[in-house]
Amino acid sequence: MRRPILALALVVALVTVALFVNTLAQGQGLPKSVTIGTNPAGTVYFALASGIAKVVSGGAGYQMVVQPHAGTSTMLPLINTGEMEFGIQNGVDLWLAYRGPAHQIGGRNPFAHTPNVRLVMRGAPLMVGLLVRKDSPIKTVHDVKGKRFTGEYRAHLAGWYNMFGHLSSAGLTWNDVKVVPVNTVNDGVDALLQNRADVTQHALNSAKVKEADAAVGVRHISDDCSPQGEERMKKAVPGYYPRIVKPGAITGVVEDTCVVAYDTYLFAGKAVPDQVVEAALKAVWEGGEQLVPIHPMFKEWTQDRAVDADASIPYHPGAVRFYKERNVWKPGMDQVQQKLLAVNP
């Protein structure tokens, strides 16, 4: 008789604890769950969002659920209107969306105006490299002229800016290549695998690149990292900067390779309550050691990168309060914040 009684007592105790935690969370104004939007499965951002969601769910007092989307253009409107709370995306896309269609890069800004996005934490830089088949004669970006080159990226517009930045580093334009239209970065890799394209791109160490390497063998090729190439890249896409990556730990990198890098943002909607943002930020802030094993990019997702004077969108008030309490909101950041808020008064 004692075992059933003990089992029943254990169940009652667990239910009581769960109810207590839920009541405590509700008392703090926290929801039962929130969503975090990101790119499709197989992308680096999906892996990052999954890691963030795991840590937040374990430490914020509520569950965070990952909601993948085709790309920035489909995800941002949901956060802007409050249908989704959080997102993982790059600072360049957010710069364009926050400022609206009048602000363009390469003559383009197809993002819907998204004035209600707010930065929670600047994370690690995303590194994106041009990708070819392993047996391709193409060695660097200077060899892509006249080649079949994935473009358009109708559902994943960051891909268009990536490719524009790669080309610009070499002083090339879209007119110098044969554009193969694709919808997403994953579709671009599929075009390479199906021999419909000679050159595509993807984030370094993504699941999709690993899949392609296992299927046919692929390698990343270098952009132009000379001082002139760097200047052309930065002028073409503000927020981009070159990175040299070495062979060894990254799939498809067989020699020192120059790639595009740009910052990743954990962000939220303007209407998300301060305490919800602070709870998520606290969990990520204190959970860095849990993040590192999930994906190599989390090695650079550090506390000292969180507050950035070159941020492309304003910080969420909950994040500002969090950083001020920890004395990491540096002198001059209030002026940066006011300048960014003034873009959409």
Label each region the model flagged.
Residues 34-37, 41-45, 53-74, 81-84, ...:
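N-terminal secretory/targeting leader peptides
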Residues 1-31, 345:
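Short, low-complexity disordered leader/linker segments with a strong preference
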Residues 204, 208-225, 232-234, 275-279, ...:
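An extracytoplasmic/periplasmic, membrane-proximal ligand-sensing/linker region
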